[in-house]
Amino acid sequence: MNKHYPHYLDLQPAMHAKGVVRLPGSKSISNRTLLLAALADGTTQIRDLLASDDTHVMLMALQKIGVKWEQIGESQDYVVHGVNGAFPVHQADLFMGNAGTAIRPLTAALAVTGGDYTLHGVSRMHERPIGDLVDALNAIGTHIEYTGEPGYPPLHIQRGRIHAQRMQVRGNVSSQFLTALLMAAPLMAREQDVTIDVVGELISKPYIEITLNLMRRFGVEVQRDGWQSFTIAAGQRYISPGIIHVEGDASSASYFLAAGAIAGGPVRVEGVGKNSIQGDVRFVESLQQMGATITMGDNWIEAKSNGALRAIDADFNHIPDAAMTIAVAALYADGTSTLRNIGSWRVKETDRISAMTIELRKLGASVEEGEDYLRITPPAVIQPAAIDTYDDHRMAMCFSLATLDGAIRKGSKIRINDPQCVAKTFPDYFTAFAKVTEDSLF
């Protein structure tokens, strides 16, 4: 959060990657937990909340709408005083940065509870779609208007009148739209059941599992019919569990586990393990397919390898964020790798399919860019390059891996432009990466 990086970082080639990394808290769990704790009856202590731009945005927004919270000393433990479903402040201007995990659930909660709210963010946020969520909410009587381009933030929310207990939302753009409706549903289900129907295929299902798991911890059960229909029975409300612990971020784990797979390892991450509620732990299955050895404990995962990585051809619909790590690991494979069903990359922090294609080509890779797939053929030699990061934390973290020496080809000197963007989810990333690669960065 308050770590300041220079305008660029030069990373030197690294022969080895080994060590132990304590992961920061999960972004997905942190922002969901903050909103649920705010909506709950009672006071919640949140342990190991992620310190990042995205969680800061959520904390500031909650404060502006009257939710009281305190940080415990210098720790990442917070106390949130729940408002039992009724935000005390009914008029606010809320800056949401580029945090999809904040703006989408908050939009639904504020539209359902009612008031006069404006939500806006950085310019990229105003290019990230929110129309499916707004359509679903307005169809049942909320009052949300676009103040810029239709279908995108900024948004102006006014008090509406909810008149229906069944709603529909498309599932193929972002699972965060369904997450937002699910989290707001108990606020509408005071006297009648609420049902949410998903139109079309639902992407990123593991993120919905995180949502349902956390709602359960706050006392709300959701009945689901496959992945097409979700029902919240009447009369349920959020009740504080007292204390809730935030797991380490499984998406952040992917870079270090990939480093262990590429450069031998062993690299161990702590804070997430075999019982994780995050779907991104399944990233390790891809590393295993590529030839890495993975071991898992209750609260740790370790990766190592003893040679060349195999090329992979796989569907990554279920783990789109962690799949970016595979795109760079593919530089070290023995042939052409194909990442399929990654269309959601195009509406993330940047158009990640386009950005990944441009930057991998700088390193010498041959890349075929499809609408929802990437086909990556590694270069004979990884070329030194200055990598642009597109204000996208995952681009910066992924491409650090191109410095590693693998069994088939060696890493190169890599310049990361605008390394500060990692503050979105992992402010200390480059310090942690330098530790496992024994690079004297700072």
Curated annotation (Swiss-Prot):
Any one Gene Ontology BP term: aromatic amino acid family biosynthetic process
Binding site for phosphoenolpyruvate: K27, G100, R128, Q176, R352, R394, K424
Broad class of the protein's primary localization: cytoplasm
rRNA-binding recorded as keyword: no
Class in the EC hierarchy, top level: transferase
The reaction(s) this protein catalyses: 3-phosphoshikimate + phosphoenolpyruvate = 5-O-(1-carboxyvinyl)-3-phosphoshikimate + phosphate
Recorded GO MF terms: 3-phosphoshikimate 1-carboxyvinyltransferase activity
UniProt binding sites for 3-phosphoshikimate: K27, S28, R32, S174, S175, Q176, S204, D321, K348
Entry keyword annotation includes Kinase: no
Cellular component GO terms, alphabetical: cytoplasm
EC number: 2.5.1.19
Subcellular location, record wording: Cytoplasm
Family statement: Belongs to the EPSP synthase family.
PANTHER family with a match to the protein in the record: AROM/DEHYDROQUINATE SYNTHASE, PENTAFUNCTIONAL AROM POLYPEPTIDE
Reported function: Catalyzes the transfer of the enolpyruvyl moiety of phosphoenolpyruvate (PEP) to the 5-hydroxyl of shikimate-3-phosphate (S3P) to produce enolpyruvyl shikimate-3-phosphate and inorganic phosphate.
Protein name: 3-phosphoshikimate 1-carboxyvinyltransferase
Organism: Herminiimonas arsenicoxydans
